[in-house]
A protein has these predicted regions:
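S-adenosylmethionine
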Residues: 1-273
């Protein structure tokens, strides 16, 4: 009935309708026809938001659920501006700014970003550290880890280490080491279908179960890397309950020493599922 259904699998459409109900499903389908919002995140390692607002060559609008994120108009080209090459900001999807915003990192913490490439979340975690403590940014893909390193360097991060390891290999070196850990887990990518229709092919090839099992393996390793009393923030870009609530259910059932911590809403319309 709408253009988006031309590339969304029927099984996925039916699944979303069952999950959301008629009213929310209609709003979800309508979202495919709405414009994409573009964002940049000010790198507070190099400049304050107040100072950047004074010198910004772009028309900016604050993203309400972040401390240092801004919308910019489609007509702008921030990736071609000298400020970008100076590392004053990172171009990032507005919603993708949320995980690093929510993880309560403080200067002096030892932090792990376990699935870190290309570096949008790692560079914000580093900014929250303000040069104190340390950040280990890991990505299993060597080529993606190179892009991660490039962005870490561009943002002027001096207390980060970039590695490319499967999470289980980190346990022998870093068991019980980290105060805060971010798992931005590999997933079926359902939340990316509007931006990148090519993700649909991956969804059809692998399915939800493949990523659910992958996430469980990551969880099994990461829980061993956290200090007692430390915090893990888990995020995905998918709607799949198996990969979201299901993964948290797996963690809590297998590691009862963990408990869910309620996150206060940063924005009244930014609701959690």
């Amino acid at each position: 009935r709408r253009i988006c259904t031309l590339y969304l699998p029927e099984s996925y459409v039916n699944r979303m309708k069952e999950l959301l109900g008629d009213e929310e499903f209609d709003a979800y389908m309508q979202s495919f026809e709405e414009k994409n919002y573009r964002g940049l995140r000010v790198n507070t390692l190099k400049i304050s938001t107040e100072e950047f607002e004074k010198i910004s060559p772009f028309a900016l609008k604050k993203i309400p659920w972040t401390d240092n994120g801004y919308y910019y108009e489609d007509s702008e080209q921030p990736a071609k501006h000298p400020y970008y090459y100076a590392g004053l900001y990172y171009i990032q999807e507005p919603s993708a700014m949320t995980p690093a915003q929510l993880l309560p990192v403080e200067p002096g913490d030892k932090v792990l970003d376990v699935c870190a490439a290309p570096g949008g979340k790692s560079t914000e975690l580093a900014a929250k550290l303000q040069g104190e403590g340390m950040l280990l940014s890991n990505d299993i893909s060597n080529s993606r880890a190179k892009a991660l390193l490039k962005n870490i360097e561009l943002m002027g991060v001096k207390n980060a280490y970039v590695v490319s390891e499967v999470p289980e290999n980190l346990v022998s070196r870093f068991a019980g080491f980290f105060d805060k850990i971010l798992i931005d887990a590999p997933c079926s990518g359902e939340g990316m279908f509007r931006k990148e229709p090519s993700m649909v092919k991956s969804w059809e090839e692998h399915g939800v179960e493949f990523f659910q099992n992958l996430q469980r393996g990551i969880i099994d390793s990461v829980v061993k890397l956290l200090k007692p009393g430390g915090k893990i923030l888990y995020s995905t870009c998918t709607f799949s309950p198996e990969e979201d609530e299901g993964s948290m259910k797996y963690l809590l059932e297998n590691y009862p020493e963990f408990q869910v911590e309620k996150i206060d809403s940063l924005w009244q319309e930014f609701a959690g599922g």
